[in-house]
Curated annotation (Swiss-Prot):
Belongs to the universal ribosomal protein uL16 family. Pfam families: Ribosomal_L16 (PF00252). It comes from Ectopseudomonas mendocina (strain ymp) (Pseudomonas mendocina). PANTHER family: 50S/60S RIBOSOMAL PROTEIN L16, LARGE RIBOSOMAL SUBUNIT PROTEIN UL16M. One of its GO terms (biological process) is translation. The keyword Ubl conjugation does not apply. InterPro entries: Ribosomal_uL16, Ribosomal_uL16_bact-type, Ribosomal_uL16_CS, Ribosomal_uL16_dom, Ribosomal_uL16_sf. Keywords: Ribonucleoprotein, Ribosomal protein, RNA-binding, rRNA-binding, tRNA-binding. Part of the 50S ribosomal subunit. GO terms for cellular component: cytosolic large ribosomal subunit. One of its GO terms (molecular function) is rRNA binding. This is Large ribosomal subunit protein uL16. Binds 23S rRNA and is also seen to make contacts with the A and possibly P site tRNAs.
Length: 137
């Protein structure tokens, strides 16, 4: 599972997930990419699950890049605990996703295979996504 090796602070405030993705919105490494068209959070488990679906479908062919990293801790208090007494412990890690963010990239496979693989990966994610190709300039 993806998570930071160490952080400056153990816990973070919830914050807001506003705006559009400025950084990480272009296909930089591969030929084809899976791009988010919705706003939300991806947990480390969801990112890994989609990665496995991608890898299994392309069967060692091509190269895959994961363009998101879960760097935000989400805390949770234990069940049946009264309110107060401080913030709960870190339960899992999430990546905050804005519309336009490239999630995964792939190269070395045909477009048809890439579309099928990304469709399988997208089924594992809680966000609406779209298939994009690299534009040569």
């Amino acid at each position: 599972m993806l998570q930071p090796k160490r952080t400056k602070f153990r816990k973070q405030m919830t914050g807001h997930n506003r705006g559009l993705a400025q950084r990480g919105s272009k296909v930089s490494f591969g030929e084809f990419a899976l791009k988010s068209v919705a706003r939300g959070r991806l947990t480390a488990r969801q990112i890994e699950s989609a990665r496995r679906a991608l890898t299994r479908h392309v069967k060692r062919g091509g190269k895959i890049w994961i363009r998101v990293f879960p760097d935000k801790p989400v805390t949770k208090k234990p069940l049946e605990v009264r309110m107060g007494k401080g913030k709960g412990g870190v339960e899992y890690w999430v990546a905050q996703i804005q519309p336009g963010k490239v999630l995964y990239e792939i190269e070395g496979v045909s477009e048809e295979l890439a579309r099928e693989a990304f469709a399988l990966a997208a089924a594992k994610l809680p966000l609406a996504t779209t298939f994009v190709k690299r534009t040569v300039m």
